[in-house]
Amino acid sequence: IYYLMDVSSEESILKVSNELAKKNIRIDVLINNAAINPKASSLKDNIRTTRLENFSTERWDSELAVGLTGSFLCSKVFGGLMAKDDKGGIILNIASDLSVIAPDQRIYEQKNLERKLQPVKPVTYSVIKSGLIGLTKYLATYWPDKGIRSNDLSPGGVYNNQDEEFVQNLSNLIPLGRMAKIDEYKGAIQFLCSDSSSYMNGQNIVMDGGRSIW
């Protein structure tokens, strides 16, 4: 079963929660993973809009509305429902290795372009992912008496047919020498969303092939 909703709209989220209530469906696990995250290839086409000097407040607002405000609203609504019946629950926020390290803008560089024209990872990505860490810690200490735990998973880059030069640049920064395979985070998600992690609360699990230790 699935429902479409706008995570940046509390009204939309409440509508879905009401539909679930009508069907006596309880949310036991909430995974916040919505984001506006441009692919590396698209950064090259949006140089003038991704660089900090040209980054618009409209884009800032729209990306934070989805990636950070959306996680707050979903946690507020669905976490609040979990807390009502004392059956506990789990909130998992999907952050990023860029929640603990700065983006290395060199991996996006293009030859024969002066610095002010080089594509970069947008500022919003780091701000949102770092913000999720703070949100998780807040939630972890807000409902513990209700049996609700909150943690983060911070994945590194996932290989998905990106530009070869980008893949090599990023892989050079990772001790394992490669990007993650698309299914390599399943085990961590299952762990964090199960009783196997019953004593874990307010933590950030970084799975980045070792990138953040260099």
Enumerate the language-model features and the residues they cover.
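Short C-terminal tail/terminal secondary-structure segment
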Residues: 49, 113, 190, 201-214
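The beta1-alpha1 cofactor-binding region of Rossmann-like NAD(H)/NADP(H)-dependent oxidoreductases
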Residues: 4-15, 57, 182-184
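Conserved NAD(P)H cofactor-binding loop of Rossmann-fold oxidoreductase domains
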Residues: 33-48, 210
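Short, small/polar-rich loop/turn modules that mediate ligand/substrate recognition or access, typified
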Residues: 144-149, 200-202
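Catalytic loop of short-chain dehydrogenase/reductase
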Residues: 49-57, 83, 92-145
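A conserved structural motif in NAD(P)-dependent oxidoreductases
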Residues: 174-185, 196
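Active-site Tyr-X3-Lys motif and surrounding loop/helix of classical short-chain dehydrogenase/reductase
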Residues: 15-22, 41, 46-65
